[in-house]
C-alpha cells in the first residue's frame, strides 16, 4: 500500500501547529517538518506527534526550504500543509483514499484552499454559516485551488523564493494533475502578521527582481 507523508516548514507556529497535526496524523505514515528557526515550543509540539524534525537554515527562499523537506521524506505520496491549516475528517479520508489508490491515474492532486477572513469586499469572498466549525468565527472565506498532494519524485520540486509552487515542475516533467476541489484545506491564519509579514515578503520579492530584472514573472510575484 502506498505511504503518505505530510511535509511542512515551520517557524514559531505553536499557536496553530497542534490543531494542524491533529487533523492529519491519522492518515499520515510519516510527518516531516523543517524548522527554520523556532524559538517557541513548535518543536516540542511536533515531537508529540512523532514528527521527524529537521533544522533547515533560512535563506530567504521558501522553495529551498520546502525542497529540503521533500528530499528527506520517504513516502510514496506527499501532502504539503502549513501550520495554520487543517483538514476536516472528510477531506482527510478523501486524501487517504487517493493515496491508497496510488492516485487513481494521477501524479498530483489539486485541492481547494479556503482562506477564512471577514473581508466581505475581497474578490471571490463567500459567506459561511455562523456555526461552521471550520470558519472559527470568521464570516466567510476566499477559495483558491492549489496543488497540495503529489507523488514523491525528485524531479517534482518547488520553485520561486516567494509564492513558491510545485505545479510548474510537475507539468514540465509530464505529471498528470487532477482537480479534486471537494477536498478542502482550511486556512485559519489568512492575513496573520499584518505589515511585518508584508514587509518580509516584499524584501524577498525585491531580491528576486534584482537577481532576475528581465523576468516578468519575478516582477509579477
Q: Each PLM stretch: what is its role?
A:
Residues 28, 50, 73-75, 106:
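Short, well-ordered alpha-helix to beta-strand connector turns
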Residues 78:
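Short aromatic/hydrophobic "clamp" motif used to bind/position activated sugar donors
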Amino acid at each position: 500500500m502506498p505511504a503518505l507523508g505530510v511535509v511542512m516548514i515551520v517557524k514559531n507556529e505553536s499557536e496553530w501547529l497542534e490543531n494542524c497535526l491533529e487533523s492529519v496524523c491519522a492518515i499520515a505514515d510519516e510527518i516531516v517538518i523543517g524548522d527554520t528557526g523556532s524559538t517557541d515550543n513548535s518543536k516540542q509540539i511536533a515531537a508529540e506527534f512523532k514528527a521527524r524534525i529537521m533544522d533547515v537554515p533560512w535563506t530567504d527562499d521558501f522553495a529551498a526550504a520546502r525542497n529540503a523537506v521533500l528530499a528527506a521524506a520517504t513516502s510514496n505520496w506527499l501532502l504539503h500543509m502549513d501550520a495554520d491549516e487543517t483538514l476536516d475528517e472528510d477531506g482527510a479520508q478523501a486524501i487517504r483514499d487517493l493515496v491508497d489508490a496510488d492516485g487513481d491515474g494521477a501524479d498530483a492532486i489539486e485541492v481547494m484552499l479556503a482562506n477564512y477572513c471577514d473581508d466581505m469586499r475581497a474578490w471571490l469572498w463567500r459567506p459561511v454559516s455562523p456555526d461552521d466549525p471550520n470558519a472559527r468565527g470568521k464570516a466567510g472565506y476566499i477559495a483558491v485551488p492549489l496543488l497540495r498532494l503529489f507523488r514523491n519524485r525528485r524531479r517534482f520540486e518547488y520553485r520561486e523564493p516567494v509564492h513558491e509552487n510545485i505545479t510548474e515542475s510537475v507539468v514540465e516533467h509530464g505529471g498528470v494533475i487532477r482537480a479534486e476541489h471537494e477536498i478542502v484545506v482550511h486556512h485559519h491564519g489568512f492575513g496573520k502578521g499584518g505589515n511585518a509579514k508584508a514587509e518580509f515578503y516584499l524584501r524577498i520579492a525585491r531580491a528576486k527582481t534584482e537577481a532576475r530584472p528581465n523576468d516578468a514573472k519575478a516582477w509579477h510575484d
